Amino acid sequence: MKRLLAISSLTLLASLVLLVVSPARSLAAQDEVTVVDALADAADSEDGDHDHDHEGDDHGHDEAAGDEHGHGDGDHAATPLLSFDGGSAIWNLIIFLCVLAILSKFVWPAVLGGLQAREEKIREDLESAEKASAEAKQMLSDYQLKLDEAASQVQTMLADARRDAEANGQKIVDAAKVEAAAQRERALSDIENAKKVAMAEMAGQTSKLAMQVARSVVGRELSADDHADLIRQSMERLPSQN
């Protein structure tokens, strides 16, 4: 495509040169014919002045010459401007070949070099655009992957936090249950100890009361054995506190 474009441009330039040169050569040829005719007229005028004494004899000759000259002018006037000239065609061909050689040596390489440089620049721009597009797509893919990873990590952290909260809550509940059981055991132990103390105090008071009653009734002091029997009997008579 580039070679055809260069050849077409060179052919167009050569044709323009030929169009400029050919009319110039035709005008030069016409000017040459005009100069020859002028010289012939001048020679005829000099001959007429030189033979003025023989005007009568040469009058017919001059008229004939005038008719011939006029006929020649008519022939020149009747000559077409676009007549084929072999010499001009050869010269035009030579000029065309010379112009074509000059253009091929100096213009053609510059044109081809410019076209190649432009094509290379366009190709590099396209490659750069494709590379930038590929990099942008890769960056977008990496960014989306990072977003997905971050979302997954957040979900994992939330699940861990929920599991830890549930585990800590269960631990707190278990600890509360253990503490409540321990407090219940301590309360039961305290109640049992208080019951035992109360029973012991009650037994002591009952023994004293029984001794006083017995002393007042019997009128004598009880022995230790009697005292123990009375305590035992009193304890048996008391209702159970359990």
Swiss-Prot record:
Transmembrane domains' residue ranges: 4-24
Keywords of the record: ATP synthesis, Cell inner membrane, Cell membrane, CF(0), Hydrogen ion transport, Ion transport, Membrane, Transmembrane, Transmembrane helix, Transport
Membrane topology type: Single-pass membrane protein
Family: Belongs to the ATPase B chain family.
Reported function: F(1)F(0) ATP synthase produces ATP from ADP in the presence of a proton or sodium gradient. F-type ATPases consist of two structural domains, F(1) containing the extramembraneous catalytic core and F(0) containing the membrane proton channel, linked together by a central stalk and a peripheral stalk. During catalysis, ATP synthesis in the catalytic domain of F(1) is coupled via a rotary mechanism of the central stalk subunits to proton translocation.
HAMAP family: ATP_synth_b_bprime (MF_01398)
Protein name: ATP synthase subunit b 2
Species: Rhodopirellula baltica (strain DSM 10527 / NCIMB 13988 / SH1)
